[in-house]
Amino acid sequence: MAAETGAITVGEYGRSHCEAHKEPLTRDDLLLIGAAQQAMIAAASEWAGPLLLTDTDALMTAAWCEMLLGERPQELMQAPKADLYLLLEPDLPWIDDGTRFFSDPADRHRFATIVAQALVDAGVPFIRIAGQGHERLAAARAAIGAMHV
């Protein structure tokens, strides 16, 4: 979507962290991941146009922390938020890429529920995106297009 919209994208720091450290994530790791992700977003937003696409942010890291450790740190919940969140439903096949978690569909659905509740608790706008291939991409395009950026 970035290519067709001209948007700047911010990748996922957590993936790099997990690839480098290969250890089970701790609370301190997740706080670091959230802070690093927010720093990447802040840096990109300085020169991005009206649309900045981010893979994740501190709010999503808070949801990860809840899933993995049973707590949602306020430090992460209080970080700046995006204008819109696309909540991707866990309706695609799971692919093991070496860092991906939760191969069990029940765990994936539980995580989606945790994310949805974190979004509600944070009071941010979000749209659920489901479907396969072009259907999923079209739904994401429509959600972003409705923002009139």
Regions found by a protein language model. Name each.
Residues 6, 50, 123-125:
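A generic structural signal for alpha->beta connector loops
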